[in-house]
A protein has these predicted regions:
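Glycan-recognition and catalytic cores of secretory/periplasmic carbohydrate-active enzymes
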Residues: 14-537
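Sec-dependent signal peptide recognition
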Residues: 1-7
Length: 538
């Protein structure tokens, strides 16, 4: 009996949430959200009074599609959706309206615009530029909005652009049409087409995805030793730029190809079977040629020889490991998972991989933080790593310190990525939960233990509202068969399933039994100023 009582006491103690950790997480999340809101307002103040659109940077007032539309504006949309709904319903929808009215040049494809009603930046239509900017807008901007918010006007904007990307794709090879000759644009297109195919099951998207993926898996890669060329010359059927870039502006093709295999395995398995061997050869060749001694990606290698061209590490190291981990999910090959784990260990040992103040950071500033932080969070979602999580907390302190008193970070479009990474980090610390309405004087932090989550609301002022929970967005927003790691996703943490039964305890009161569809309406809370509310959900 004594042993049984001791066991029960230990079990009860183990089940007690670590409220001090939840409080610490709430402070970290609260700062991330507050800083994100300040960036949003600082850039809204810089909008052109005539067009309503946002500048590229302090000394370039143009709305540049690949930058202003892709990397700045979308994350202001996401910030406003969670932190200030009147701004979301007002300014953010207004910018979308103006962008659609003023920047469409080739069907629904967008081009760069001067401020003050002066018209397009380029007097003549340059299709390669329009295709590049529009592909970036979709992949880096409209995809992440849809990942986290679901079916909004920005989703339909992406659909329109994608439809005209198919219709106007300017290049042909024997297997179909291509939007570009570059790995970046084709990789962007594959990622967009994969997710639209999951969601809509529209065969046009799937057919175009297959045409692009066939070009790489069955045509280009066998000719290059399974390293994609940065740029291919269709006229000579040979590399125009024979390097492969492991950093962004190059690595997009690998993520796109792994997404293509994941998609076709579910929707067109005979095609996925055809790509299995080329996929393995691609992933193996990348791991063989592209890692430094620590197991982290270099910047670029020569396609013909596999020799390193630029040895500096890729600051967005996690992006390529998303693809390697997806390869693990597709093949079951343990070496792919081990490569990801090895890289996570290396990042802990050398904090410069999270941000290199003397290297990549000198060129890219805060954006070098953003790409690394995002990659770490996506991988942490699949492979918990307490030491990497702690290293990320330290990196965030440096990241926060880059923001100026007026809310601006660095006066260029990369400030939008500051919002993205800060909010993604905040959701990590709150396990995907959020307070509605948002009040920066009220903090929310969480700790997780298996299927249970403990959430602590700390009110610096009286607050009344609801606690909202995340859902399985990969399934509900995209209709995906599996939640594989992918570029520009927002990781899912504690998600609420409609038909599942939950035990909910608020401030130690008698537990309530609630179904997920009830929790999805939001858990009502009222917290006096200077007090806390403790919520446990199992």
């Amino acid at each position: 009996m004594r042993l049984l009582l001791a066991f029960m006491a230990c079990a009860a103690a183990a089940a007690t949430p670590d409220w001090s950790a939840a409080d610490a997480n709430g402070r970290l999340a609260g700062e991330a959200l507050s800083r994100s809101r300040r960036v949003m307002h600082a850039w809204l103040n810089l909008a052109d009074p005539v067009t309503g659109l946002l500048p590229r940077m302090e000394n370039n007032p143009n709305w540049v599609v690949r930058d202003s539309a892709a990397d700045l504006y979308p994350f202001m949309v996401i910030a406003s959706a969670f932190l200030e709904r009147p701004v979301y319903d007002g300014s953010m929808h207004h910018i979308l309206r103006q962008e659609m009215l003023l920047t469409r040049r080739a069907g629904h494809l967008s081009d760069d615009l001067q401020p003050g009603g002066k018209g397009f930046v380029r007097p003549e239509l340059v299709m390669d530029e329009v295709m590049f900017g529009s592909s970036e807008y979709m992949k880096d901007g409209l995809l992440p909005i849809t990942e986290i918010l679901g079916e909004t006007p920005w989703y339909f904007r992406m659909r329109d652009i994608a439809d005209d990307m198919l219709r106007l794709a300017p290049y042909k090879w024997r297997g179909g049409r291509l939007p570009a000759q570059t790995a970046e644009i084709n990789g962007n297109a594959l990622q967009v087409l994969a997710r639209l195919s999951w969601k809509t099951r529209d065969p046009r998207y799937l057919d175009q995805l297959i045409a692009i993926a066939d070009f790489y898996f069955l045509h280009q890669l066998p000719a290059t030793g399974y390293l994609p060329a940065h740029e291919w010359d269709l006229a000579t059927d040979s590399p125009r730029r024979g390097v492969f870039v492991f950093s962004d502006h190059g690595n997009e093709i690998v993520g796109g190809l792994t997404e293509a295999v994941m998609l076709t395995r579910a929707l067109r398995p005979e095609k996925a079977k055809q790509w299995e061997t080329p996929l393995k050869k691609l992933l193996d060749r990348l791991l063989e040629t592209g890692r430094n001694a620590d197991g982290v990606w270099v910047h670029s290698v020569d396609v013909a020889t596999g020799k390193v061209v630029a040895p500096r590490h890729a600051h967005c190291w996690g992006y390529m490991f998303n693809a390697i981990y997806t390869g693990y999910l597709l093949t079951g090959e343990p070496r792919y998972k081990q490569a990801v784990e090895h890289a996570m260990d290396a990042v802990v040992k050398n904090p410069n991989y999270l941000f290199d103040e003397a290297g990549a950071g000198r060129k890219w500033g805060a954006n070098a933080y953003s790409d690394s932080i995002e990659g770490a969070l996506v991988l942490l979602n699949r492979l918990p790593h307490p030491r990497l999580s702690a290293a990320l907390d330290e990196a965030m302190k440096k990241y926060y310190a880059r923001q100026r008193d007026n809310g601006i970070v660095e006066y260029w479009y990369g400030d939008g990525n500051y919002i993205r990474s800060a909010m993604m980090y905040a959701f990590y610390k709150s396990q995907g939960a959020a307070l509605a309405p948002y009040d920066e004087r009220v903090r929310l932090g969480a700790v997780r233990e298996g299927d249970a989550v403990a959430l602590l609301v700390s009110a610096g002022a009286p607050w009344q509202g609801v606690l909202r929970f995340d859902v399985a967005r990969h399934r509900e927003h995209w209709n995906m068969a599996q939640n594989y790691p992918r570029l520009n996703e927002w990781p899912e943490w504690f998600t609420v399933e409609p038909g599942r039964l939950y035990e909910v305890t608020v401030n130690g009161a008698e537990p309530q039994r609630m179904f997920g569809f009830e929790l999805r309406k939001g858990l009502p809370l009222s917290v006096p100023g200077g007090r806390q509310a403790r919520v446990e959900i199992r």
